[in-house]
């Protein structure tokens, strides 16, 4: 679906309202986890076969928000999402509004899912998860999700990871638009300080302190550098966010840039995170097309240009980012030697 460039706040809000209505009209949703782990287990084959089967049955398949959906028609949506957790049980398929969750799904299971569940309203026990005594049909029945309150990951697994309209329907870019038109840079910094936000890795630096240092810098040109290629073995924190909700990162970078007086940013993605890199680049292109990145964003007079590069740090973060921005290659031996001293 071609995106129209938005020229004002009013145009953004009208578009967001339309996205919300279309999203709400999808009263039947099928979510196929297409995070890296599920993709390696054949998730795209499942997604493609589901799409073919639904179309063969003559069911309306709203694959992309805003297309193939006539007024009054039942909304039937098929979505490829990012990771929602429980990777050892993938590929995962979830069906709403029942909330039914299937694990270890294969392409061979698709016809049974369509016939029994989609058309017949029947849960397939053999594809369900167990807690030792009974089949757990929904996420609410699983201890894995007990006590979880998702904020950064709120939309991961809930939207198509490659669709800007769905992100906007779930309130993404609303915070940026508010900051853009209703707040001064100092008010943004104060809000971040009051929230008590800290870094999620390393020493857990206070975010507002780092932002204030950048805002106070008087250099003629400042650049925002974001590292999405953490080396914490097995953590995949950055990858999960970028794969499942890339517009969340872009909105965050845009708010930082606004608060600190920055007009250019670089996001570095681990070279092995190919899905994350692809989705972040696609999200960047979508945001540019919609007028949420670039020059004179929404007619505000503010500019922010984003670049996405594949890169991996082998030096402490601050040194790596500065060297990389200046096209200087780091020396692996220096990093490994220092890391054990």
Regions found by a protein language model. Name each.
Residues 277-341:
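Hydrophobic alpha-helical positions that pack around
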Residues 10-13, 66-81, 194-220, 239-245:
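Conserved alpha/beta core surface patches that mediate binding of polyanionic ligands
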């Amino acid at each position: 679906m071609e995106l129209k460039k938005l020229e004002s706040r009013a145009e953004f809000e009208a578009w967001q309202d339309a996205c919300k209505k279309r999203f709400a009209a999808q009263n039947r949703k099928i979510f196929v986890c297409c995070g890296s782990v599920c993709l390696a287990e054949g998730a795209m084959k499942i997604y493609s076969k589901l799409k073919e089967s639904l179309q063969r049955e003559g069911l309306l398949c709203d694959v992309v928000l805003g297309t193939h959906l006539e007024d009054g028609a039942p909304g039937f949506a098929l979505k490829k999402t990012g990771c929602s957790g429980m990777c050892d049980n993938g590929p995962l398929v979830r069906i709403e509004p029942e909330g039914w969750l299937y694990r270890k799904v294969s392409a061979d299971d698709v016809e049974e899912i369509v016939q029994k569940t989609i058309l017949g309203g029947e849960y397939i026990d053999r594809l369900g998860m167990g807690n030792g005594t009974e089949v757990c049909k929904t996420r609410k029945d699983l201890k894995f999700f007990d006590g979880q309150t998702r904020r950064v990951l709120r939309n991961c697994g809930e939207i198509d990871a490659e669709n800007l309209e769905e992100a906007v329907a779930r309130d993404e870019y609303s915070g940026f638009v508010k900051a853009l038109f209703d707040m001064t840079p100092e008010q943004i910094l104060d809000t971040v300080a009051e929230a008590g936000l800290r870094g999620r890795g390393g020493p857990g630096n206070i975010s507002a302190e780092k932002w204030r240092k950048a805002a106070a810098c008087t250099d003629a040109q400042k650049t925002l550098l974001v590292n999405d290629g953490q080396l914490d073995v097995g953590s995949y924190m950055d990858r999960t966010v970028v794969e499942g909700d890339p517009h969340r990162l872009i909105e965050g970078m845009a708010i930082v840039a606004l608060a600190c007086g920055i007009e250019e940013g670089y996001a570095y993605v681990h070279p092995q995170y190919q899905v994350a890199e692809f989705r972040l680049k696609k999200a960047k292109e979508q945001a540019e097309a919609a007028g949420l990145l670039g020059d004179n964003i929404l007619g505000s007079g503010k500019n922010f240009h984003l670049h996405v590069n594949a890169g991996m740090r082998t030096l402490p973060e601050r040194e790596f980012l500065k060297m990389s921005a200046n096209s200087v290659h780091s020396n692996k031996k220096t990093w490994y030697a220092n890391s054990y001293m």
